[in-house]
C-alpha cells in the first residue's frame, strides 16, 4: 500500500485518506442538510473561507456565507445531498453529488434533483475548508420557488 504525504504532519495511505475525506463529506452534508447555517458554517468553513456559488459574488467569511444560506434556506422544506463520487488531493476534495430540494409551501412536496460538482479547499487532517466552490445549475430550483410563490399570491 503506497502512502501519500497529505498533510505536513500526517502520512496516510490512500485508503485511509479517502475514508477520512468520505467521513468529513458525510458530516458536512448532514450538518448542511439540517438547514441551520450557523453551526454548519462555523464548524466546516474557516473564518476567512471564500465561497463561490453560481450567480453570486464571491462570499468571504462566516458572516457573508451564513447570510447567504439563511436566505436560501428560507425557501426550503428540505435539502438532501447524495455523494456520487469524490477524489482527494493533498489540499482539496473534488465531489460529484446530487442535491434533492423540496421547496417550502409546495403542496406536492415534489423533490427537485440537481446534479453538481464541488471543490472543498481542505487537506486531510484539516477540519475546516479555506475555500468552497460549487458548480451547478440552480435554475430548476429557482423556477419551482417562483411557481410556488405565484400560486400562493392572492
Residue ranges, per PLM feature:
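Low-complexity proline/serine/threonine-rich segments in eukaryotic and viral proteins
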Residues: 1-2, 61
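A beta-strand edge to alpha-helix "cap/lid" segment located at domain peripheries
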Residues: 2-15, 70-154
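Short acidic-aromatic low-complexity motifs
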Residues: 11-47
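Short, mixed-charge, low-aromatic patches
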Residues: 19-29, 53-55, 73-78, 130
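Exposed alpha-helical structural elements
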Residues: 20, 40, 64, 140, ...
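Hydrophobic alpha-helical core bundles mediating ligand binding, dimerization, or RNAP-core interactions
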Residues: 25-32, 45, 65, 69, ...
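A solvent-exposed, acidic/Ser-Thr-rich amphipathic alpha-helical stretch
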Residues: 38-92
